[in-house]
Swiss-Prot record:
Taxonomic lineage of the native organism: Bacteria, Bacillati, Bacillota, Bacilli, Bacillales
Record pathway: Pyrimidine metabolism; UMP biosynthesis via de novo pathway; (S)-dihydroorotate from bicarbonate: step 3/3
Residues that coordinate or bind Zn(2+) 1: H59, H61, D151, D304
PANTHER family for this protein: ALLANTOINASE (PTHR43668:SF2)
Residues at the catalytic site: D304
Protein name (record): Dihydroorotase
Swiss-Prot/TrEMBL keywords: Hydrolase, Metal-binding, Pyrimidine biosynthesis, Zinc
Name of the encoding gene: pyrC
């Protein structure tokens, strides 16, 4: 099916929002201009809505194989499509871990069979993510590994991390890290700060993250490797990354929507839906994340979509697993709480969710350019809705944002020229 989207707006190559039509033919973007006419195309009047590149998320958890009670490739990618994401990068904390040919081939077959959006899997740095034996990077790259990470289990051994970075550099691949110094975690379930003190909970100190980033940055410099920092959360981490960039070290970083919108002061009670890793930090950390995003220290926004069951989250804040679901709330949360409040512009938000992650990792995504694959999201910037977890397509309903009123909701997502998801009656 060919589609002609009429009367939309998009961000042009100069970074300005302008009026446009957009023609999709044979799965590709055929033309982006005003007043397009075309035969043999279904005309869809978007009536002034935003025509955006499909959103790109480099940090997601799909849980399959091994955790299908939390999420599946089918449910997770359908939730991603509903959130406007057309390309997502799946972390390797599955069971089994994609750490060898057999496991990666199985994962890729599952993706091919079930995914509603483009899914790029990470390969594990170490076998079973336990940090003792490096995986075969060459084989994992051959089978389509997006980059290498041990995800939520930071590589604690410096010699192992250096060896991994050297091997990745030879393959022109990135090493991606969840940064925690295990000896400083302190069995914490929240940030070490006012909230932990008030509720008598063990806290995770900010330095637990920043000291690990500092170590890895120096290792990356020694290996001449692209090193990407997951979900930055502290003022100290922002400072370390900023200094490294100024020194010319190949480091990039991401921040989550929840760390941009919330801090520990916003946690109403010992609610496990506010438990994520890294935890919500203090006000100064929150301000530093915004500053880092605006000055280029932090390159992109990624959801860290981490679904869990209601039963798991009901165990209480100390025993419940870390993580919140993120696909279906990311854009409206960021648009409402950052763009509408004048903290960043709409153009910047689009870049942080599209071209910046795509460019950082060399993906042919993130831009509406003629000849490229038609991965597109239509967003109604005027639509206001209340976040209702019962309507999520993800199996995970674990969100701290239930009841929040937000503007800027995706209404249609196109992947490879085909409609992957659309809101009923939104485009008539």
């Amino acid at each position: 099916m060919n589609y002609l989207f009429k009367n939309g707006r998009y961000m042009n190559e100069e970074g300005k929002i302008v009026a446009t039509d957009l023609l999709v033919q044979d799965g590709k973007i055929a033309k982006v201009a005003e007043n397009i006419t075309a035969d043999n195309a279904e005309v869809i009047d978007v009536n002034g809505k935003l025509i955006a590149p499909g959103l790109v998320d480099v940090h997601v958890h799909l849980r399959e194989p091994g955790g299908e009670h939390k999420e599946t490739i089918e449910t997770g990618t359908l939730a991603a499509a509903k959130g406007g994401f057309t390309t997502i990068c799946a972390m390797p904390n599955t069971r089994p871990v994609p750490d060898c040919r057999e496991h990666m081939e199985d994962l890729q077959n599952r993706i091919k069979e079930k995914a509603h959006v483009n899914v790029l899997p990470y390969g594990a740095i170490t076998v079973r993510q336990v940090g003792s034996e490096m995986t075969d990077f060459e084989t994992l790259k051959e089978l389509g590994a997006f980059a290498f990470t041990d995800d939520g289990v930071g590589v604690q051994d410096a010699s192992m991390m250096l060896a991994a970075m050297k091997r990745a550099a030879k393959l022109n691949m990135a090493v991606v890290a969840h940064c925690e110094e295990n000896t400083l975690i302190n069995k914490g379930c929240v940030h070490e700060g006012k909230f932990s003190e008030k509720h008598g909970l063990n806290g995770i100190p900010s330095v637990c993250e920043s000291v690990h980033i500092a170590r890895d940055i120096l290792l990356a410099e020694a290996a001449d490797c692209h090193y990407h920092v997951c979900h930055v959360s502290t003022k100290g981490s922002v400072r370390v990354i900023r200094d490294a960039k100024r020194a010319g070290i190949k480091v990039t970083a991401e921040v989550t929507p929840h760390h941009l919108v919330l801090c520990e002061d916003d946690i109403p009670s010992a609610d496990p839906n506010f438990k994520m890793n890294p935890p919500l930090r203090g006000k100064e950390d929150h301000a530093a994340l915004i500053e880092g995003l605006l000055d280029g220290t932090i390159d992109m926004i990624a959801t860290d979509h981490a679904p869990h069951t209601a039963e798991e989250k009901a165990q209480g804040i100390e025993r419940a697993p870390f993580g919140i679901t993120g696909f279906e709330t990311a854009f409206p949360l960021l648009y409402t709480n950052l763009v509408k409040k004048g903290i960043i512009t709409l153009e910047q938000l689009i870049q942080f969710l599209t071209e910046k992650p795509a460019d950082t990792f060399g993906l042919e995504a993130g831009r509406l350019k003629e000849g490229r694959t038609a991965d597109i999201t239509i967003i109604d910037l005027e639509q206001e809705e209340e976040i209702d977890p019962t309507t999520f397509l993800s199996k995970g309903k674990n969100t701290p944002f239930a009841g929040w009123k937000c503007q800027g909701w995706p209404v249609m997502t196109i992947v490879g020229g085909k409609i992957a998801w659309q809101k009923e009656s939104a485009l008539v």
